[in-house]
């Protein structure tokens, strides 16, 4: 945000997210962006602001939705969002995700991931509410360090010998085929809310 790293200024449901993970949006209800100095709000963090990711939680409205997609570079995408009420004030929600595919214009690079996010809610539409929810994400990727910008329009380096270099093919892969990025992330959250009055929770 405005030239500052937000690595330590990213929150999930109001809790600081310290994991270095490329997060998927399959289980997000909304993204809140707060701009400006926010030290009095969140404590230590970037002076540019912070980001809060809000997870999907159960509601009393029964609903099923999903997405299915296929794109270039053999990209495939599948998501499902299932919400089911269990009583007058409790509900269950399940979000699922599966993604596979290569990267456009790049050889060798592949990305694969899946995610499961169950959630339970009790006391919905009452003064006291309890939410129990978790998320499991697994990623199996081949890391891509990109390509050299030598020879591209606008490239400049104080070393004249580099300026004379030829442009490389964007399909070239400069990593190792045996390299891997194997990520497994689990989160479990308990949220308790109680309405003290009409304006205070």
Cite the ranges covered by each PLM segment.
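Short, P/G- and charge-enriched loop/turn segments at secondary-structure junctions
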Residues: 38-40, 177
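Periplasmic plug
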Residues: 1-37
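Outer-membrane beta-barrel translocator/receptor signature
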Residues: 26-29, 40-116, 124-130, 186
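Acidic/polar loop-and-plug regions of large Gram-negative outer-membrane beta-barrel proteins
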Residues: 99-104, 111-195, 199-201
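Glycine-rich, histidine-containing beta strand-loop boundary motifs that form or position
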Residues: 12, 35, 96, 132-134
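Solvent-exposed coil/turn segments that connect beta secondary-structure elements
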Residues: 4-6, 15, 36-38, 56-58, ...
């Amino acid at each position: 945000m405005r030239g500052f790293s937000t690595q330590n200024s990213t929150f999930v449901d109001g809790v600081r997210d310290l994991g270095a993970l490329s997060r998927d949006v399959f289980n997000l209800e909304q993204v809140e962006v707060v701009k400006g100095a926010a030290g009095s709000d969140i404590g230590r963090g970037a002076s540019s602001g912070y980001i809060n990711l809000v997870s999907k939680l159960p509601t009393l409205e029964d609903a099923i939705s999903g997405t299915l997609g296929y794109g270039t570079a053999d990209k495939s995408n599948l998501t499902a969002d299932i919400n089911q009420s269990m009583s007058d004030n409790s509900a269950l929600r399940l979000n699922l995700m599966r993604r596979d595919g290569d990267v456009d214009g790049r050889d060798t690079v592949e990305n694969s991931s899946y995610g499961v996010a169950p959630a339970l809610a009790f006391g919905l539409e009452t003064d006291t509410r309890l939410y129990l929810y978790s998320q499991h994400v697994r990623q199996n990727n081949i890391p891509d360090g990109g390509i050299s910008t030598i020879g591209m329009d606008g490239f400049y380096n104080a070393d004249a010998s580099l300026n004379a270099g030829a442009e490389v093919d964007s399909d070239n892969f400069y990593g190792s085929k045996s390299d891997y990025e194997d990520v497994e992330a689990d989160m479990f959250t308990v949220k308790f809310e109680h309405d003290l009055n009409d304006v205070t929770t």
